[in-house]
């Protein structure tokens, strides 16, 4: 490729990024004044595929209930990592039955898991941040990429009150890496509002929430929190970094350290 071609490609890419960012900002302004049902209906009515990825947490259940109850044209997907709590797995079927919807499951590739285990061991994520990020990459990031392939809008259950590094979460933001717009319809909902809504609407939730698990991920990487701790304090609790994330919502350099199945011994 010539230098001129590279420059033209860079200019085109920059234009795409600017357009995505402008659309996200315009959407953010529109979503702010709407209620949850209105926010989701607005996204469902846009041109392009909208995908909601649920971890079956309490806020995700609120969104799933709104999608199902209003029969919105939004795909619902979940990442079956292979290390989920039994309670979480059971809730998938219960939620499908309750709202007569399909929750599409996305699984990690066996070859990727084998490569990870060969390099780090089954529970190597306890040994280093690098190994933990690699596990999240294999079990979450790669399946997520398949779930979002071809999507224009990615709906999440992110809330500003979940952790310090989510405190400025907007209703809509450009995800340049994935080439789509991320929608956070519950960004301004507090946990008390979530709990009251769940109780009023009879929304099924994970029983682990009542046992001290406000944030629930994979079983080996989640513990109950102590009184007064932040909502996500039980996630990867053995790590010291306050910005503990799996890489789904906050890109992390080490999340690119995903074992290559072709190099597995």
UniProtKB/Swiss-Prot annotation:
Pathway entry: Sulfur metabolism; hydrogen sulfide biosynthesis; sulfite from sulfate
Cofactor: [4Fe-4S] cluster
Primary localization class, coarse: cytoplasm
Keywords in alphabetical order: Cytoplasm, Iron, Iron-sulfur, Metal-binding, Oxidoreductase
Keyword Disulfide bond: no
Cofactor note: Binds 1 [4Fe-4S] cluster per subunit.
One Gene Ontology cellular component: cytoplasm
Top enzyme category: oxidoreductase
Binding residues for [4Fe-4S] cluster: 135-136, 218, 221
Superkingdom in the source lineage: Bacteria
Pfam families reported in the protein's UniProt record: PAPS_reduct
Entry EC no(s): 1.8.4.10
Compartments where located: Cytoplasm
Biological processes per GO annotation: cysteine biosynthetic process; hydrogen sulfide biosynthetic process; sulfate assimilation, phosphoadenylyl sulfate reduction by phosphoadenylyl-sulfate reductase (thioredoxin)
InterPro entries, sorted: APS_reductase (IPR011798), PAPS/APS_Rdtase (IPR004511), PAPS_reduct_dom (IPR002500), Rossmann-like_a/b/a_fold (IPR014729)
Catalytic residues as annotated in Swiss-Prot or TrEMBL: 246
Gene Ontology MF terms in the entry: 4 iron, 4 sulfur cluster binding; adenylyl-sulfate reductase (thioredoxin) activity; metal ion binding; phosphoadenylyl-sulfate reductase (thioredoxin) activity
Family assignment from sequence similarity: Belongs to the PAPS reductase family. CysH subfamily.
NCBIfam families from the UniProt entry: APS_reductase, PRK02090.1
Cited function: Catalyzes the formation of sulfite from adenosine 5'-phosphosulfate (APS) using thioredoxin as an electron donor.
HAMAP family: CysH
Name of the protein described by the UniProt record: Adenosine 5'-phosphosulfate reductase
């Amino acid at each position: 490729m010539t230098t001129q071609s590279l420059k033209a490609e860079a200019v085109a890419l920059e234009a795409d990024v600017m357009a995505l960012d402008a659309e996200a900002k315009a959407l953010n302004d529109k979503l702010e004044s709407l209620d949850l049902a209105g926010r989701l209906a607005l996204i469902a009515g846009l041109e392009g595929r909208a995908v909601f990825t649920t971890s079956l947490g309490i806020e995700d259940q609120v969104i799933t209930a709104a999608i199902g109850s209003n029969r919105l044209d939004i795909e619902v997907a979940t990442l079956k990592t292979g290390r989920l709590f039994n309670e979480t797995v059971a809730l998938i079927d219960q939620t499908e039955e309750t709202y007569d919807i399909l929750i599409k499951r996305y699984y990690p590739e066996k070859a990727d898991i084998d490569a990870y285990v060969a390099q780090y061991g089954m529970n190597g994520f306890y040994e280093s941040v690098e190994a933990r990020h690699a596990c999240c990459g294999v079990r979450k990031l790669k399946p997520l990429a398949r779930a979002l392939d071809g999507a224009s809008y990615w709906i999440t259950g992110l809330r500003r009150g979940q952790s310090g590094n989510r405190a400025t979460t907007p209703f809509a933001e450009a995800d340049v890496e994935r080439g789509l717009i991320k929608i956070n319809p519950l960004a301004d909902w507090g946990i008390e509002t979530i709990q009251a809504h769940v109780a009023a609407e009879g929304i099924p939730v994970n029983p682990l929430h009542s046992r001290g698990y406000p944030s629930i991920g994979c079983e080996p990487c989640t513990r109950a929190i102590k009184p007064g701790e932040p909502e996500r304090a039980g996630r990867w609790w053995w790590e010291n970094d306050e910005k503990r994330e799996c890489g789904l919502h906050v890109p992390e350099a080490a999340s690119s350290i995903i074992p290559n199945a072709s190099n597995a011994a």
